[in-house]
UniProtKB/Swiss-Prot annotation:
Taxonomic lineage of the native organism: Bacteria, Pseudomonadati, Pseudomonadota, Gammaproteobacteria, Alteromonadales
Function (record text): Catalyzes the conversion of 3-deoxy-D-arabino-heptulosonate 7-phosphate (DAHP) to dehydroquinate (DHQ).
Cofactor: record remark: Binds 1 divalent metal cation per subunit. Can use either Co(2+) or Zn(2+).
Alphabetical list of InterPro entries matching this protein: Dehydroquinate_synthase, DHQ_synth_AroB, DHQ_synth_fam, DHQS/DOIS_N, DHQS_C
Single Gene Ontology MF annotation: metal ion binding
Species of origin: Pseudoalteromonas translucida (strain TAC 125)
Cofactor(s), names only, from the UniProt record: Co(2+); Zn(2+); NAD(+)
Name the record gives this protein: 3-dehydroquinate synthase
Keywords: Amino-acid biosynthesis, Aromatic amino acid biosynthesis, Cobalt, Cytoplasm, Lyase, Metal-binding, NAD, Nucleotide-binding, Zinc
UniProt key word Amino-acid biosynthesis: yes
Pathway: Metabolic intermediate biosynthesis; chorismate biosynthesis; chorismate from D-erythrose 4-phosphate and phosphoenolpyruvate: step 2/7
Family designation: Belongs to the sugar phosphate cyclases superfamily. Dehydroquinate synthase family.
HAMAP family the UniProt entry points to: DHQ_synthase
Length: 356
């Protein structure tokens, strides 16, 4: 088993990566402490892992709550339903929520934990590649609003993150590909060696080679932990983790949450960001081809939805959380392994990019 830490002084916490970490009863019970565990999962993951986890925690009198599977359920409606469940079961501050599932379960559970009785502990047990390499680490919790993704949320760190690579063997191929978009992102913003590794190991990763999986998950979590330790509340450096997301959130909001997977939207968003960087002479045409080529190799989309216009993009981008004083700000690659936050992209440049 691999282990690393997110260093945030008294709120630091470990990340455990390996096979069968979902069965690591000793560590899990240690992090639950004297609390009563409440497992939050969805109706896809529950048949696979819920009973095993309940059996492990039987002496702690656990409860569970199951939500439907899908991005559209990361909402205030389901936030309220989980909160009502906790209240109906007289759950106090000595309650520990366990998020067993992908990014939707993790974000929703974390937001409930942040708000319920002004904050209770929670543990992340991510079961998708995207949540393992990105959303489970760093304390971003949120629900979506019809007018924008992740618009209602809080920064709230978990007690621990348990990443079980075996869960990826039950993940649909489309979901695995979506997770690879976030892995590629880390290579683009921070680590040229990781990007090259992804180019060299496409087949091994798609075959779920254990050594390859542990390598990329560990490296992504390591990068995320380093960035979060320096900029927990996304005032500067952490914003670079949003490469491709300005475009991606516009796609998700316009198309309807769940129509495009988050990773699919991020993949296309990174291609658009690379093309925009090319127009600014920060990347070469060969760089753009290399980026879009790797994204395509992992069976991810590189073209925007045919029904979306430049005005659709601009409408949603004007609500982006990175904006300042009404100016849309983008994360753009300046070279492989480096990105920058820019605020001098005009609406006409966006229109030209989308309409080309």
């Amino acid at each position: 088993m691999l282990e690393l830490s997110v260093n945030l002084d008294e709120r630091s916490y470990p990340i455990y990566i390996g096979q069968s970490t979902l069965q690591d009863n000793g560590r899990l019970v240690h992090h639950i402490g004297d609390c009563r565990p409440i497992i939050i999962t969805n109706d896809t993951i529950a048949p696979l892992y819920l009973q095993g986890l309940l059996a492990q925690l039987a002496t702690l009198n656990p409860l569970h709550f199951i939500i439907p599977d899908g991005e559209q359920y990361k909402s205030l409606t389901w936030f309220e339903k989980i909160s009502a469940f906790l209240l109906e079961n007289n759950c106090g501050r000595d309650t520990c929520l366990i998020a067993l599932g992908g990014g939707v379960v993790g974000d929703l559970t974390g937001f409930v934990a942040a708000c319920y009785q002004r904050g209770i502990p929670f543990i992340q047990m991510p079961t998708t590649l995207l949540s393992q390499v990105d959303s489970s680490v760093g304390g971003k919790t949120a629900v979506n609003h019809p007018l924008g993704k992740n618009m209602i949320g809080a920064f709230y760190q978990p007690q621990a993150v348990f990443i079980d690579t075996q869960s990826l063997h039950t993940l649909p191929a489309r979901e695995f590909a979506a997770g690879m978009a976030e892995v590629i992102k880390y290579g683009l913003i921070y680590d040229t060696e990781l990007f090259a590794y992804l180019e060299q190991n496409v087949e091994r990763l798609q075959q779920l080679d254990e050594a390859c999986l542990q390598h990329i998950i560990y490296r992504c979590c390591e990068i995320k932990a380093l960035i979060v330790a320096q900029d927990e509340k996304e005032q500067g450096l952490r914003a670079l983790l949003n490469l491709g997301h300005t475009f991606a959130h516009a796609i998700e909001a316009q198309m309807g949450y769940g129509v495009w997977l988050h990773g699919e939207a991020v993949a296309t968003g990174m291609v658009l960001a690379a093309k925009l960087a090319y127009t600014r002479q920060d990347l070469t045409a060969e760089d753009v081809t290399r980026i879009s080529g790797l994204i395509a190799q992992y069976s991810l989309p590189t073209q925007i939805p045919a029904v979306m216009t430049s005005e659709h993009f601009l409408q949603h981008m004007r609500k982006d959380k990175k904006n300042k004083k009404g100016t849309i700000r983008f994360i753009l690659p300046t070279q492989f392994g480096q990105c920058a936050l820019v605020d001098d992209v005009s609406d006409d440049q966006v229109r030209a990019l989308i309409e080309q």
